Regions:
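Short S/T/G/P-rich N-terminal loop/turn motif that feeds into the first structured element of a domain
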Residues: 1-49, 58-66, 82-104
């Protein structure tokens, strides 16, 4: 089973540099969590940010949710960085992958 966290957000005006510093710190920290699988970041043309983080199981996801520096980053996010955010955490029920490989 894989647990997927989808974090969508919008930043307040003028916080980009401070936000990037904290985001980089969190990007490094989450990789230390036992059960962390991978993460991806996307930025839409309208400014919405999307972070997708995958964990091996619910215990791994919970360790991250309760990780002290992550809790502090969440607090700062609410107080300093975000004008809006939405978090969805769910179990991956199915997964399909396709990869086209050209012959050389």
């Amino acid at each position: 089973m894989v647990v997927v966290t989808v974090f969508r957000s919008r930043l307040r005006e003028g916080v980009e540099l401070d936000y990037q510093s904290v985001a980089l710190e969190m990007e490094r920290a989450v990789k230390t969590i036992d059960g962390f699988l991978d993460q991806r970041f996307y930025l839409a043309d309208d400014g919405e940010r999307v972070t997708i983080v995958r964990f091996r199981d619910w215990d791994s996801q919970r360790r991250w949710a309760e990780y002290p520096s992550h809790r502090e980053a969440q607090r700062r996010g609410r107080e300093e960085f975000y004008s809006w955010y939405d978090i969805e955490v769910c179990e991956e029920r199915t997964s399909h992958e396709f990869s086209f490989l050209e012959e050389s």
